């Protein structure tokens, strides 16, 4: 039944994703972060106090998320096993973000194909932190491909990894870790101190999933009739061409699969950030690379699901 719950949750994400007006735990986690952050800022003046307060905030948010998820699941199981199973499916479903990621990328791709640069810049600004107001088509394509490649780890592979390790409650706790990083894990002045622990713990949580994504995306590239060997080679070569210890693993693999370059200079919060280039520019990036990257994401996520199911079945057999 556990394996069936994983599969149904994955299929639900593939088909419907996260409908905009449905209740979603990540929104609740976000409200909790906002509430706790307000308290920390009120009582923790100075950078040192903010770093400590940020660490306490991380423990409170992640611990509360795991505890509530475990408690709700246990209560649902006591009411009725089938009800508990249904709640488990729903929890797992909410930790996966493949369809939402694909939909967001396609929202940028659509006006770009229609040469509506202004609309594609607006839609892109909803999913990236960089300044999109002056981006040209090639830069927009690059930003979308990078976002899909990076979030293949955060949105699918990592939640499945923690689901395998500790069930739905641990997968929910991972979403709290990831949401904390998304909200406060920045290096600019406002968040540098309070978000330090959140940023570093997100790096720790994604350490193994990011490296697994290199292998899965490389295999996916071969299955998608792209260059799997080049994906693995470039992915390994450029795996550290990023300020994050994790992001370049998936981005470099996708760049290698497609034969394009990612990375390079961007503007964040009014500041120019010169990132290393990732991949080799064997051709110019195009709008079609967005749909190719989405396809790589889905194939890699299918492989991840199959891998963790096989591992779980293997462990069950040993037990």
From Swiss-Prot:
| Membrane topology of this protein | Multi-pass membrane protein
Task: Please provide the Gene Ontology terms (biological process) for this protein.
Answer: cobalamin biosynthetic process
Q: Where in the cell is it found?
A: Cell membrane
Protein family per UniProt: Belongs to the CobD/CbiB family.
Taxonomic lineage of the native organism: Bacteria, Pseudomonadati, Pseudomonadota, Gammaproteobacteria, Enterobacterales
Q: Which GO terms describe its cellular component?
A: plasma membrane
Q: Which organism is it from?
A: Salmonella choleraesuis (strain SC-B67)
Pfam families linked to this entry: CobD_Cbib
One MF term from GO for this chain? Answer: ABC-type vitamin B12 transporter activity
Q: In which pathway does it act?
A: Cofactor biosynthesis; adenosylcobalamin biosynthesis
Q: Which UniProt keywords apply?
A: Cell membrane, Cobalamin biosynthesis, Membrane, Transmembrane, Transmembrane helix
UniProt keyword Ion transport, yes or no:
no
Entry's transmembrane regions: 56-76, 82-102, 153-173, 204-224, 296-316
Chief subcellular site? membrane
Q: What is this protein called?
A: Cobalamin biosynthesis protein CbiB
What is this protein's function? Converts cobyric acid to cobinamide by the addition of aminopropanol on the F carboxylic group. However, the true cosubstrate could be (R)-1-amino-2-propanol O-2-phosphate, leading to cobinamide phosphate.
């Amino acid at each position: 039944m556990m394996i069936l719950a994983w599969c149904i949750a994955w299929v639900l994400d593939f088909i419907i994703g996260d409908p905009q007006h449905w209740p979603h735990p990540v929104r609740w986690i976000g409200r909790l972060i906002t509430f706790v952050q307000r308290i920390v800022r009120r009582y923790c003046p100075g950078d040192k106090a903010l770093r400590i307060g940020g660490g306490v905030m991380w423990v409170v948010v992640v611990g509360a998320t795991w505890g509530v998820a475990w408690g709700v699941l246990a209560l649902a199981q006591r009411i009725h096993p089938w009800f508990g199973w249904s709640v488990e499916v729903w929890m797992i479903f909410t930790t996966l973000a493949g369809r939402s990621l694909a939909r967001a990328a396609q929202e940028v791709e659509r006006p770009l194909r229609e040469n509506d640069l202004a609309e594609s810049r607006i839609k892109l600004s909803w999913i990236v932190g960089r300044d999109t107001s002056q981006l040209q088509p090639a830069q927009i394509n690059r930003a979308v491909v990078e976002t899909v490649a990076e979030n293949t780890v955060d949105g699918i592979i990592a939640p499945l990894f923690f689901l395998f390790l500790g069930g739905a409650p641990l997968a929910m706790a991972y979403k709290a870790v990831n949401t904390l990083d998304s909200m406060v894990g920045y290096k600019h002045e406002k968040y540098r101190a309070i978000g330090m622990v959140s940023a570093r713990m997100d790096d720790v949580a994604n350490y193994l999933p990011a490296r697994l994504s290199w292998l899965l995306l490389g295999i996916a590239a071969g299955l998608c009739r792209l260059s799997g060997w080049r994906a693995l080679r470039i992915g390994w070569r450029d795996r550290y061409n990023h300020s994050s210890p994790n992001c370049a693993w998936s981005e470099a693999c996708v760049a290698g699969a497609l034969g394009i370059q990612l990375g390079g200079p961007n503007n964040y919060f009014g500041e120019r950030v010169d990132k290393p280039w990732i991949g080799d520019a064997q051709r110019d990036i195009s709008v079609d690379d967005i749909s190719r990257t989405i396809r790589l994401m889905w194939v890699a996520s299918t492989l991840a699901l199959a891998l963790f199911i096989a591992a779980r079945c293997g462990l069950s057999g040993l037990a």
